[in-house]
């Protein structure tokens, strides 16, 4: 009998989330409590943090058999398994002692068992950052903007205008400016207390693109020369958040 069981309706959502997570962190510890399933970890350079939370109500079945369960995973291994997820697949995760069973269910059932990673769980605090700018957009808008900038710059600069968000990238050969606004339909919501700006390594934004593919919406929050917070919102109240430290020039 499994120590814990999590049954989710859409395996591909987890496929896309884990594809982004594994580009930033190698290993991590999931913590399941009565409220939900969570993960919080820093990358090795301490430039980026990944913060995942899914409420228990988002699962078809959520059974932890006690107050809490912790299980460590290699995201490289988990991502390789989840790449096999098809459009119609449901996902079951079962904690079986020192192993994690990953089941993909549709017309049949495929089971992959991978070893848990033994690591000390360190509860990281949530970053204390005040944001003056908040822009909410579709996942497709976020993906297209980052892809337009990727070939031309190693740095992404966010600039808050009065009624629009400006994304800027430049190199010796080209400068790219992308303006997103509610009036043009590219933003779902926009708030700017001041016209702040901040710059970040575009590499981290590129690594978020898989997760954005499955997101209902993406929220970008930042302040002058402060860490950016990028929230991926998913069906059922799930959330995958990335914090990235700024590049100070």
From Swiss-Prot:
UniProt keyword list: DNA replication, DNA-binding
Superkingdom per UniProt: Archaea
Pfam families: PCNA_C, PCNA_N
Any one Gene Ontology BP term: leading strand elongation
Keyword DNA-binding carried by entry: yes
One term of GO molecular function: DNA binding
Subunit structure: Homotrimer. The subunits circularize to form a toroid; DNA passes through its center. Replication factor C (RFC) is required to load the toroid on the DNA.
Similarity comment: Belongs to the PCNA family.
Function: Sliding clamp subunit that acts as a moving platform for DNA processing. Responsible for tethering the catalytic subunit of DNA polymerase and other proteins to DNA during high-speed replication.
HAMAP family per UniProt: DNApol_clamp_arch
UniProt-recorded name of the protein: DNA polymerase sliding clamp 3
Organism: Aeropyrum pernix (strain ATCC 700893 / DSM 11879 / JCM 9820 / NBRC 100138 / K1)
Native organism taxonomy: Archaea, Thermoproteota, Thermoprotei, Desulfurococcales, Desulfurococcaceae
